[in-house]
Amino acid sequence: MINIMNSDFNNIKSTLDATDLQLLATLQADASISNIALADKLRLSAATCLRRTKRLLQEGWIEKQVAILSSDKVGQLMGHSVTALIEVSLDKQGEELLQAFETRAVQETAVQQCWRVSPGPDFMLVVQVPDMPAYLAFTQRLLTQDANVRNVKAFFSVKRAKFGTQITLPTA
């Protein structure tokens, strides 16, 4: 068994066994798998598998289950698409100012990822917009109008070589 402490769970100790880790790894690879197929793969009864999955959801091990769209296909459908990786440095880095920018950034639907980073810029954003006019509108809304934004450096994707969502889990 692997004991994991996480302050996000109010310091409640959660214990994951080998079956829980296999279940999480399988769901990371394909969350659309049916409970029966998942149970068969893990050699569990369907009821036990469902109970474990619900527990992992309730404890916060699984944040959400989504369908990941092909950015290439969506780009073809729309005729274009712009992905920008943006470094943002703030003028003042007090906790309340960092939190204020973060709150505004995560409310933007164009922002797919928002990371506080160190050293270097204060934030890294991954932004997906349909075209350059939409990018300009986004930057004016989030970056230009914020007096605390000191520096912005944007990089535009010309090719996505890899995109993954799986987290490497320990083996029991």
At which residue positions do the language-model features occur?
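A compositional/biophysical signature of low hydrophobicity enriched in polar/charged and small residues
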Residues: 1-172
